[in-house]
Amino acid sequence: MTPLIFASEGFGLNLNIFETNIINLAVVVFGLYKFLPGFLGKILEKRRTTILSDLKEAEERLAQAQDSLSQAKDDLSSAKQKADKIRNDCKVRAEAIRLESEKRTVEEMARIKQGAASDLSAEAARVTSQLRKEAAELAIEKALAMLPKKLDSNTQDNFLKQSIKNIGDN
């Protein structure tokens, strides 16, 4: 057994190369140094490439999303402008329709009033004519009723002569 340097009851520094496995450790470190960079380097390079491509793809999707957002904002703005224009056009059209409706209503009222006035005039003329006719008929009836009493033969002769004379003068 090799002596332990600076040993004190169970703990110390062992300088025996074979007992401490320094050679085994050196072989493992040399193997790792020789073979690990190629193997681990390929894995790390592949991982780095994957991460870079994922980042690039994410940036492209971000750019597309920003373009889509910008396009959507433009479309929304355009749609709002069209909606405002349509709303204003509808207001103007509604006002024009309202004014036209009022105008037609006033014209219709004037036509109805004119029709009523002409109907009233026609009815008044008809009633007046009817009253004149009835008055004339009553006057003729009274005259016919009174005529035999007042008309004697002498008056009849004078009346006939006067009528013949009037016919001859015409």
Swiss-Prot record:
Gene3D superfamilies documented for this protein: F1F0 ATP synthase subunit B, membrane domain (1.20.5.620)
The record's SUPFAM superfamilies line, in alphabetical order, gives: F1F0 ATP synthase subunit B, membrane domain
Q: Which GO terms describe its cellular component?
A: plasma membrane-derived thylakoid membrane; proton-transporting ATP synthase complex
InterPro entries tied to this protein: ATP_synth_B-like_membr_sf, ATP_synth_b/b'su_bac/chlpt, ATP_synth_F0_bsu_bac
Superkingdom of the organism of origin: Bacteria
Q: Which GO terms describe its molecular function?
A: proton-transporting ATP synthase activity, rotational mechanism
Instruction: List the Pfam families hit by this protein, alphabetically.
Output: ATP-synt_B
Location comes to:
Cellular thylakoid membrane
Keyword annotations from UniProtKB, A to Z: ATP synthesis, CF(0), Hydrogen ion transport, Ion transport, Membrane, Thylakoid, Transmembrane, Transmembrane helix, Transport
Q: Name the residues that span the membrane.
A: 22-44
Membrane-protein topology: Single-pass membrane protein
Where is it chiefly localized?
A: membrane
Q: What does this protein do?
A: F(1)F(0) ATP synthase produces ATP from ADP in the presence of a proton or sodium gradient. F-type ATPases consist of two structural domains, F(1) containing the extramembraneous catalytic core and F(0) containing the membrane proton channel, linked together by a central stalk and a peripheral stalk. During catalysis, ATP synthesis in the catalytic domain of F(1) is coupled via a rotary mechanism of the central stalk subunits to proton translocation. Component of the F(0) channel, it forms part of the peripheral stalk, linking F(1) to F(0).
Return the similarity comment. Answer: Belongs to the ATPase B chain family.
Q: Which PANTHER family match?
A: ATP SYNTHASE SUBUNIT B, CHLOROPLASTIC
Which NCBIfam families does the annotation name?
A: ATP_synt_b, PRK07352.1
Assembly and partners?
F-type ATPases have 2 components, F(1) - the catalytic core - and F(0) - the membrane proton channel. F(1) has five subunits: alpha(3), beta(3), gamma(1), delta(1), epsilon(1). F(0) has four main subunits: a(1), b(1), b'(1) and c(10-14). The alpha and beta chains form an alternating ring which encloses part of the gamma chain. F(1) is attached to F(0) by a central stalk formed by the gamma and epsilon chains, while a peripheral stalk is formed by the delta, b and b' chains.
In its UniProt entry, what is this protein called?
Answer: ATP synthase subunit b
Q: Provide the species name.
A: Prochlorococcus marinus (strain NATL2A)
